[in-house]
Amino acid sequence: MPLEERRSSGERNDAAPTNHRRPGEKRASTAKQVSSVPFLGAAGHQQSLPSSWKASCSGPLVMASDSDVKMLLNFVNLASSDIKAALDKSAPCRRSVDHRKYLQKQLKRFSQKYSRLPRGLPGRAAEPYLKRGSEDRPRRLLLDLGPDSSPGGGGGCKEKVLRNPYREECLAKEQLPQRQHPEAAQPGQVPMRKRQLPASFWEEPRPTHSYHVGLEGGLGPREGPPYEGKKNCKGLEPLGPETTLVSMSPRALAEKEPLKMPGVSLVGRVNAWSCCPFQYHGQPIYPGPLGALPQSPVPSLGLWRKSPAFPGELAHLCKDVDGLGQKVCRPVVLKPIPTKPAVPPPIFNVFGYL
């Protein structure tokens, strides 16, 4: 039914029971019916109403169109979304960071750090080796100070132990390439032919004072009698055999200088070594009673046997005290021929004390 026909029928129904109404009231009632149109599309028809009828309608009774409502809702939605996005957006980064360059720097730094360490010990550096060498010196000094019974005895020997030129020279030669090329000096990193090794590495160890024993038991042809120009250590003559029972390590025996005994051959000195305690791998060996074991078939091999020397072999080392028949044997310490360099490489030094 068209809108005009419905409106005219409504006017007829209102005019039938109440004829005393004014014309303005009838139009207001019809406007109420038009504004409460239930079906869709009424807004479109409402816009096409005559202008004269629109002007006569009051303001609160006119509803906004659906397009206006949709436009308003769309605006509110966009505004709220823009505000929410503005609030959620983080602040711009003030400093631009090149993450790839940063990671490359970190990798380079850590690769250089770990390439200087030995492969077997990732947590240890080469510095503990140098510290260990400095800690060993006071221990050896205390070991050497132990057997001295008299306050002024053995002063010259202590100075010689501290001032060992061969040991200091080897230590200086080994530390020099480590400072110049720290990466090349570590074992397992660079091939042997490319390492910066000292010249003494390729030679046999040659201690300052060594004995070259021939078949006859005498000194070799290229070495003369040792320690001719050196003075004897003072205060070692009155030492008795009770001072020889102090256990000493082979390293301390190797570092102590041998005594000067004129007129005694090397065989006598070697045999005399068997009467002194010799500690091997922490097991001290003390001299037993004379003549307890049978005599060795080769007298010059007294160095390698653990049995004590015999009276015939030690006759030239003992002297009478005041002619009473009491004999006092002097302690004799010989320096063994070393089979390896005095300063081992750092990797073996670390494993050797575990």
Curated annotation (Swiss-Prot):
Cellular component, GO annotation: cytoplasm
InterPro entries to which the protein is assigned, alphabetical: FAM181, TEADIR3_omega_loop
Pfam families: TEADIR3
Chain intervals with Basic and acidic residues compositional bias: 1-14, 129-142
Top-rank taxon: Eukaryota
Residue ranges, annotated region (Disordered): 1-35, 117-160, 172-193
Family to which this protein belongs: Belongs to the FAM181 family.
Protein name: Protein FAM181A
Annotated source species: Homo sapiens (Human)
Gene: FAM181A
